[in-house]
Amino acid sequence: MEKNDMMNDEDIKEFHDLDKLKDPYKPLPHGLVIADSQINGQGLFTTRRLVRGTHLGESHYRFDGKLVRTPLGGFINHSNEPNCVRSQVRVKPHYDKWTITIIEDIEEGEELTLKYTMYDPEKI
């Protein structure tokens, strides 16, 4: 694909198989809400218990160098003792996504957090 070309339907399908999704656009995963945070502004909070290893979804996408942030990526706050980790996945050349995974059990009402610097892959 040339840099100035638009993505076609096949590129989109290959990037993220929309046919497998019941609802292709879900702003936040089930069990998460945006609420006022004591850390900074607003943050992501649980409405139910979530266990270590739960994959929450994509926080960011990069298409041909342009970064797109999802609500999941836009509202998760920083902590030096995070309960989530973000991982980069190369989907295909020029297309990356970042996913968020829980690294410790989180009780209902707790805020989700990431460490905005480098992550330790051993904690996943």
Residue ranges and their predicted role:
Residues 1-124:
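Conserved catalytic SET/PR domain of SAM-dependent protein methyltransferases, capturing the structural core
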